[in-house]
């Protein structure tokens, strides 16, 4: 359990190019954003609040007893939306906030707790996040699976869509065998292992409010990974290594049907 109280904020944007109206998509009788909030409510959070960009999301949350605030519809990112939510909620600068994505209806409550606990455990970190060991070469080479390399203290060196860390002397399956051997030889040093980044974040509210004012990083623009902005500007990101694979998120109609099947079984 976390060593300090924390608030879960769930960004919810009605428009989606691949799945219009995604936050309100029905999953076994409940809007998806309500499902996410209910899962987050099983964590140790003192409160869970949806940061919505449309009145229809706020109304759906209210109908199911979920707290929500209405934010501007012109935010460029979920982080910008949560920064406004911090202001609307009057959070103090040292308050811990966990960003749970609004398309993760199967997120594990204990993962939320673990990511929230990173900041009290690692005072030098501005952000916390999570990662899981990659178990296939296909995932390692898939640009839609974001990788992270960590140092011996569990801080992120870099995030990339490319296969990192790269073994210069090997390729393909030979690389995979070399990486597995290196990870086994140094189990206390997660930087040797290929790790999949999980898109959950913790911040102190003061840092979250300042994040939109940081200039975008060239690496962030190149990789389309917003967390690289923090590293570019010298901030540290602590990484929780979880032994459990993350539950499936919902980005496409096919993803939605898979999650519906799991929750209706």
Curated annotation (Swiss-Prot):
One Pfam family, short name: CTP_transf_3
GO MF annotation terms: 3-deoxy-manno-octulosonate cytidylyltransferase activity
Transferase keyword on record: yes
Single GO cellular component term: cytosol
Keyword Thylakoid among record annotations: no
NCBIfam families in alphabetical order: kdsB, PRK05450.1-5, PRK13368.1
Name of the protein: 3-deoxy-manno-octulosonate cytidylyltransferase
